[in-house]
A protein has these predicted regions:
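Short connector loops at helix/strand junctions that flank enzyme active sites
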Residues: 10-15, 32-34, 87-91
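Generic secondary-structure transition motif, activating predominantly at the C-termini of alpha-helices
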Residues: 2-7, 79, 133, 137-141
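Conserved Nudix-box catalytic region and its N-terminal flanking loop in Nudix hydrolases
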Residues: 21-60
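Unchanged
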Residues: 44-68, 75-132, 168
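Acidic, metal-coordinating catalytic segment for phosphate/diphosphate chemistry
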Residues: 1-16, 22
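Residues embedded in well-ordered beta-strands
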Residues: 16-18, 25, 93
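Nudix hydrolase/Nudix homology domain
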Residues: 36, 107-168
Length: 168
């Protein structure tokens, strides 16, 4: 049983799939809501693990089948340069590997594609900011880092985590 929001307010969880191809391009989807681009993903659903959300959202938004590889980062949206919004949000970024499928649309996605990191389209800034993409590109090259949960402006590489959590 879940308590109504008026009883105990908790953060919403936004899960994003981080997917790069062999050309080092990142997969983005064009959101119907604002016509701008973001990493595949969305609100976490009750009954799904974060890994399952990343896989489900990627399949629904892109037509691709992926495997969730590892958690790259958990961030508190208010500690990063996102526009103000109505919810308190934690964002989870999960590195995924493409297993198959064909890029195809969905009811709430206008388009999808892979983009070079130095030639990104206009981003849906409530969902994905340029700093997200830069940080995920850096973190994916450091498998020794279990996950990242500190402020983006304080990250330095090589990064030695002071804590870790299992993911799998």
């Amino acid at each position: 049983c879940y308590l109504p929001a008026k009883e105990y307010v908790t953060p919403k969880v936004d899960v994003r799939a981080v997917i790069f191809n062999e050309k080092n391009e990142i997969l983005l989807v064009r959101e119907k809501a604002d016509g701008r681009w973001a990493m595949p993903g969305g609100w976490s659903d009750v009954g799904y693990t974060p890994k399952e959300v990343a896989v489900k959202e990627t399949r629904e938004e892109t037509g691709l089948d992926v495997r969730a590889e590892r958690l790259l980062a958990v961030i508190d949206k208010r500690c990063h340069p996102y526009p103000a919004g109505p919810f308190y949000v934690y964002k989870m970024f999960i590195l995924c590997e493409v297993l198959g499928g064909v890029l195809s649309g969905s009811f709430d996605i206008l388009d999808q594609g892979f983009f070079a990191l130095d030639n990104l389209p206009p981003l849906s800034l409530d969902r994905t900011i340029p700093e997200d993409i830069r940080m995920m590109d850096e973190l994916r090259h450091h498998p020794d880092i279990p996950f990242h949960s500190i402020r983006m402006d304080s990250i330095q590489f090589p990064y030695t985590p002071f804590h870790s959590i299992p993911f799998g």
